[in-house]
Amino acid sequence: MYYRTRTYIAGDWDNDKDAVDALHRWNDSSRYGLSFSDAHELKQARDTSLNCSIKRSLAERLDASKTFILIVGEHTKELRAGGCQYCNSYNSYWGTCGRGHTVDTRSYIDFECEKAIRDGLKIIVLYKSTVVNRSKCPEVVRNRGIHAPMEKWVGNTLYWDYDSVRNAIG
């Protein structure tokens, strides 16, 4: 059993890792006022683990969290990784798991968002963009929580918008 003191960050780790890295840089720097304990530091799941094992590990991290941050990029809404149908143990004819686990066809993102809502976590949706475009956000959190852009234009140069993120996180 964990105390809910952590911040859980979800997103497209293949395409939007730079946004996650920006959050960590702001958190680790004494120059910025962002301060959070990352829930992903609690327990690691190997990328070679079964989807159901990874979801169990994600659930443990969410159980220790009070805040859920979702990074929304170009492809976040379309991500499908994590569903049982993509596991070698899944029998598509019968719709069952060959290892006897419960079948869960949700992606990791959908699983994380739904658990954050069910657990009553503070939800923050940060868009890897200069604008909030809710059509890119997974439907389950589209109208929940605080939504804010992570980027801004200064002249002709695109920068991370620390002030927008800090105001959203609080």
Predicted feature locations:
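Surface-exposed, flexible loop/turn segments at secondary-structure boundaries
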Residues: N15, T76, V131
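Conserved BB-loop
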Residues: S30-S57, E74-S89, W94-V103
